[in-house]
Amino acid sequence: MAENADLVEWPKKDKRRFLHVVYRVGDLDRTIQFYTECFGMKVLRKRDVPEEKYSNAFLGFGPETSNFVVELTYNYGVSSYDIGTGFGHFAISTQDVSKMVEAVRAKGGNVTREPGPVKGGGSVIAFVKDPDGYTFELIQRGPTPEPLCQVMLRVGDLDRAVKFMEKALGMRLLRRIERPEYNTIGMMGYAEEYESIVLELTYNYGVTEYTKGNAYAQIAIGTDDVYKSAEVVKIVNQELGGKITREAGPLPGLGTKIVSFLDPDGWKQVLVDNEDFLKELE
C-alpha cells in the first residue's frame, strides 16, 4: 500500500513537460510552407522512413530541448484525413493577430473568424484553418517564450478529464472557465499559462461523445522514469478509465523508452524518457 502511495505522488515530483503534438497531413511540403510563411515557425528536423512509408517534420518557434513543437506525419499516398468532432484547435500567440491573419489570407488560408475582441473579454483573437483543415486560434499577447500555446481537445466529462490529467500526468488545473450558456473549459499544464503550452479541455453541455477521426494522433510528454510513470497510469486507468496501448519499453530501432495510453475520453498520450529524447536530438 505504501508503495502505491509513493507511486501516486510520483507524477508531481517528476520532471514533466510537453514535448510535441503529433498529427497527420496530406502534403508535407504544403504544410511546412504554410506554417513557416504564415505563422513564422521554423523547420527543426525532418526524417523519411521509406520502409514504413512515412515522413515526419518537426516545426516550432524554438529548439525542441526547451519548446513545444508540432510533429507532422505524412503517410505515403494519403492526401486527406478526417479530423473528427473531438479535436478542437491549436493556438499561437502573436503580438499582431491582424498581420498574421493577412499572411494566412495571402497564402490562400481560410479565415473562419476575423480578428476582434473575445466575447466578454479584452483579448484580441482570430481563427484560421490550415490546408488540411486544422483550426488555429491566434491570440494577441506580448512576447512569450512559447508562442505555440494551446492544444484544445473536447471531452465528455470535464471533472473526470481534469482528475485524469492531474493524477496520471501530474498536470495542474491552471484555470477553469464557466460559460453557463454552452460550455466549461479546464486549462491544464505544468507551468503558468502565459509562459508555456497548455492543454485546453472543453466540455460542451450535454455532449458526452465525439468522433476521433484519423488525423490528430497524440501528445508526447517527457518523464524521468517511463516504467514508474506507466505504473501510475495503470492505477489511474483502473479508477477513471482509459487503457495502456503500448507497454513501457524501448522503441525498436530508436531505443527511446516510451509508454502510450488512452485517457478516459480516448485521447492518446505518450510518455517519453527525457534522457532518451535528448539523445534523439543530438
UniProtKB/Swiss-Prot annotation:
UniProt keyword annotations, A-Z: Acetylation, Lyase, Metal-binding, Repeat, Zinc
Residue ranges annotated for the VOC domain, each copy included: 17-141, 147-274
GO molecular function: lactoylglutathione lyase activity; metal ion binding
Cited InterPro entries: Glyas_Bleomycin-R_OHBP_Dase, Glyas_Fos-R_dOase_dom, Glyoxalase_1, Glyoxalase_1_CS, VOC
Residues forming the catalytic site: 137 (proton donor/acceptor)
Residues the record lists as binding Zn(2+): 20, 71, 89, 137
Name of the protein described by the UniProt record: Putative lactoylglutathione lyase
Source species of the chain: Brassica oleracea var. gemmifera (Brussel sprouts)
